[in-house]
Amino acid sequence: MNDYLDVTELSGDDVSSEQVLRCSHRYFWAGHYCKDKDVVEVACGTGPGLGFLLRQAKSLEAGDISEPILNIARKYYGNRLPLKKFDACKMPFTDNSKDVIIIFEAIYYLPDIDKFIDECTRVLRPDGEILIATANKDLPEFNPSPYSHNYYGIIELKEIFQSRNYDTQFYG
């Protein structure tokens, strides 16, 4: 199995100011939806926004499929929040237990988006929300990850989620 270390931003990596701004904006945006809610971040990677979300949410759990990446997050966060290894399509949470599920820059790694949506539907409480940030495949400078399964455009995501009775909103 791929550990995604070669495509994950790690502490000490060179990153552009644009990358930092995009990451910050995603989590500040998510913070509004997570305020005093039970939240899980799926595919959390090294956890760049978990500290902020921890201060916003009533409860926060996070996980990733890559144990080496989770170990990096565990070194930083220690016992401040539960970090678990899990597959986004088989989450270790009880039915109707979360208000918000976050998946940032990882939906394209999922081999089956329908299984992911089924799992979100199981885990989310009624009126729960899924927050997604993803690459825009329609931009000229788009650079796909070598491990991706499928990049979705806005129209595709809208159709997929609305066919499953989710209301959708998109921000550019």
Regions found by a protein language model. Name each.
Residues 114-126:
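A short glycine-rich, Lys/Arg-flanked "PGG" loop and its adjoining helix->strand segment in the class I
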Residues 166-172:
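Conserved S-adenosyl-L-methionine
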Residues 1-90, 117:
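Conserved N-terminal segment of class I S-adenosyl-L-methionine
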